[in-house]
Amino acid sequence: MIQATGIGAVLGGITAKVTQHSGIVGAIIGGVVGAITGQKLSNMQCDYEGQEEILLSKINTAIENNTYLINQTNSLNQHMSTLYSQINTMQANQQTNLRKKSYLISEINKKKREILNIKTLNNNVLLKVRQYNSLLKNTKYSKQDKERVQNTLQKITISLQKIKRASIYNLKQLDEFKKKVQHA
């Protein structure tokens, strides 16, 4: 038995918060994604076959991807608030020019592409996390250590599912925004 150390196998204390906004964007997440409390796995005992180290490294990558997606969603939500404000201002002004409308539609389309990219990466990470859960069963970790990793993977999955729902909501909102601009 040797320790799986020196592999950067710390699942980190990630505090993943999704910013909430007032108004139409307020319901995007339906609350805070929640703190993903990672645990140190570097002191886990296992029979060394290399498989465990690779798996932990992959889980760390999944956590990094999850954090990136949360940050992207936060940033996107802030932009959505700004966009919504601009559309409201435009609707209040009867003299809206075509250049302004064209700019807003261009921004909306850009945000839609960003969301679709987030959705794609999010789905890929979700798929990988499911695979890691399966791989974990074939490792020689103790039952207790396996449960620790499974708990972390479960927290990542919950967070990713919330991001997925947020992306779907955001896409619907952007379609509504587009209609408002086109009919202004």
Segments predicted by a language model, with ranges:
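Short, low-complexity, glycine-enriched hydrophobic/amphipathic alpha-helices that associate
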Residues: 1-49
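Helix-termini ("caps") and immediately adjacent flexible loops/tails
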Residues: 1-3, 39-184
